[in-house]
């Protein structure tokens, strides 16, 4: 079987609340770490989320 091109990643909040989103990314086209601005319900505002590994 071939290696999958999409991998699951965890987007961890930079507000240090421990809140995270799980999403997928194409590892061949997006080689650098992903960052997105999304809503953190614990902090109750939009913050930047950075990519972290799923354990």
Curated annotation (Swiss-Prot):
> Which InterPro entries does the UniProt record give?
Ribosomal_bL33, Ribosomal_bL33_CS, Ribosomal_bL33_sf, Ribosomal_zn-bd
Q: Name one Pfam family in it.
A: Ribosomal_L33
Q: Which GO terms describe its molecular function?
A: structural constituent of ribosome
List the GO terms this entry assigns under cellular component, sorted alphabetically. Answer: cytosolic large ribosomal subunit
- The protein's superkingdom reads Bacteria
Please cite one Gene Ontology biological process associated with this protein. translation
Tell me yes or no: is Ribosomal protein among this UniProt entry's keywords: yes
Q: Which UniProt keywords apply?
A: Ribonucleoprotein, Ribosomal protein
Question: Any keyword Ribonucleoprotein?
Answer: yes
Q: Which NCBIfam families match?
A: PRK00595.1, rpmG_bact
Please report which protein family the annotation says this sequence is part of: Belongs to the bacterial ribosomal protein bL33 family.
Query: Entry's HAMAP family?
Result: Ribosomal_bL33
- How is this protein named in the record? Large ribosomal subunit protein bL33
Q: What is the species listed in this Swiss-Prot or TrEMBL entry?
A: Rhizobium meliloti (strain 1021)
């Amino acid at each position: 079987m071939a290696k999958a091109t999409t991998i699951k990643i965890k987007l961890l909040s930079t507000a240090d609340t421990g809140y995270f989103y799980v999403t997928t990314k194409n590892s061949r086209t997006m080689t650098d770490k992903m960052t997105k601005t999304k809503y953190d319900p614990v902090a109750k505002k939009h913050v930047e989320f950075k990519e972290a590994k799923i354990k």
